[in-house]
Amino acid sequence: MIDRKLLLQDFDKVALSLKKRNNAMDDELERLREVITHYKKRLIELEGLQAFQNKVSKEFGIKMAQKVDTSDLKKELENNKIKLNELSKSVGELEQQIDLKLSIIPNLVDEKTPLGTNEEDNIEIKKILTPRVFTFKPKEHFELAQQNGWIDFESGVKLAKSRFSVIRGFGAKIYRALIHLMLDFNEKNGFEIIYTPALVNEKMLFGTGQLPKFKEDVFKIENENLYLIPTAEVTLTNLYNDTIISVENLPIKMTAHTPCFRSEAGSAGKDTRGMIRQHQFDKVELVAITHPKESDVMQEHMLESASEILKALELPHRFVQLCSGDLGFSASNTIDIEVWLPGQNCYREISSVSNTRDFQARRAKIRFKENQKNQLAHTLNGSSLAVGRTMVALMENHQQADGSIHIPKALEKYL
């Protein structure tokens, strides 16, 4: 969440940030500011009543010791206690209103993030590796997968519904090999390998920003306070939920391979064929918790770590700076890595590395202690990489004229 103090002290800054996202919430912000102002007034009243209660209680004790009549003081204490209880309840209700309203306001846009409306305004930073020139028309991955018997889309629909797949045979071996390669590269770059639950409670999804605003995008277990994770960002980040970390232990660098589950609400008609957009997919995630001064450097490190894997797999890719209108809810700054897909003749996102600054840390109460003072940490997350999309890129970039797939040398030892 954004800092409630900032909203009171610099309302225009928050409003401008939302406009940069093309998400003007002026009315909601104004109502929130009114609630916070009212809350502060009531809090001052409450503190005054508490001070008065303490003062009268001391007088009551002194008079009791002196065996002086205390009936008037006793009545005053009782009346004041009723007012205190009523005011405490009012303050508590206002706090809940504030937290609920703050929880649906997205992160402030970083100064480095360029202005823009949508993905058309994103800026290419650099390209890595030159796309191969084919002597034949390259096929799309779903054609190659079916030809080689690696992916069974029909069985995925039979077992579940559309946007599910079954990977089998040598395709399954490649899929497993990619996961092992990704984890090995991430570990080499200093990220601790962690396996986490694929189910989390509501508090964890609130901590990383999926709830309450994006409830329709996650799968909930019926009659349980449990949800299937949309990304290991949720579990890795929330390992430190409500935790104070010693500054000497920063940065904390983690990686995890997990299945991910997304309802893909609002994606009807997009990427209906193949493995680009699935309800269930595997991803190897990077998460870092850092000192605020180090988060920009960490973002670069995470990008290079993901890029290193793509270079090893001989997959052309590029870095793209997301504009303000294309940022995710929790992100302050995001750089995507897009991989070249010759079958589609375009670049597609395969990793998204985001710096959330202290936005998630404030929601999840992730702090560090420095010089005897507790401060909010910065959190970052990014794919390294989306396994299915990496397999898609592998098939399309390394296809041969007969439909067979060349295996890059870096992957051979894992097969």
UniProtKB/Swiss-Prot annotation:
Keyword entries, A-Z: Aminoacyl-tRNA synthetase, ATP-binding, Cytoplasm, Ligase, Nucleotide-binding, Protein biosynthesis
Catalysed conversion reaction: tRNA(Ser) + L-serine + ATP = L-seryl-tRNA(Ser) + AMP + diphosphate + H(+); tRNA(Sec) + L-serine + ATP = L-seryl-tRNA(Sec) + AMP + diphosphate + H(+)
PROSITE patterns: AA_TRNA_LIGASE_II (PS50862)
Coiled-coil positions: none
Binding site for L-serine: T231, A232, E233, E285, S383
Domain of life: Bacteria
Pfam family membership, one: tRNA-synt_2b
Any Gene Ontology CC annotation: cytoplasm
Binding site for ATP: R262, S263, E264, E349, I350, S351, S352
Database matches in CDD domains: SerRS_core
Main location: cytoplasm
Enzyme Commission number(s) of this protein: 6.1.1.11
Ribosomal protein keyword on record: no
Annotated InterPro entries: aa-tRNA-synt_IIb, aa-tRNA-synth_II, aa-tRNA-synth_II/BPL/LPL, Ser-tRNA-ligase_type_1, Ser-tRNA-synth_1_N, SerRS_1_N_sf, SerRS_core, tRNA-bd_arm
Record-level Gene Ontology MF annotations: ATP binding; serine-tRNA ligase activity
Enzyme class: ligase
Compartments, as annotated in UniProt: Cytoplasm
Metabolic or biological pathway, per its Swiss-Prot or TrEMBL entry: Aminoacyl-tRNA biosynthesis; selenocysteinyl-tRNA(Sec) biosynthesis; L-seryl-tRNA(Sec) from L-serine and tRNA(Sec): step 1/1
GO biological process, one term: selenocysteine biosynthetic process
Record family assignment: Belongs to the class-II aminoacyl-tRNA synthetase family. Type-1 seryl-tRNA synthetase subfamily.
Annotated function: Catalyzes the attachment of serine to tRNA(Ser). Is also able to aminoacylate tRNA(Sec) with serine, to form the misacylated tRNA L-seryl-tRNA(Sec), which will be further converted into selenocysteinyl-tRNA(Sec).
Comment text on domains: Consists of two distinct domains, a catalytic core and a N-terminal extension that is involved in tRNA binding.
Record note on quaternary structure: Homodimer. The tRNA molecule binds across the dimer.
Listed NCBIfam families: serS
Protein name: Serine--tRNA ligase
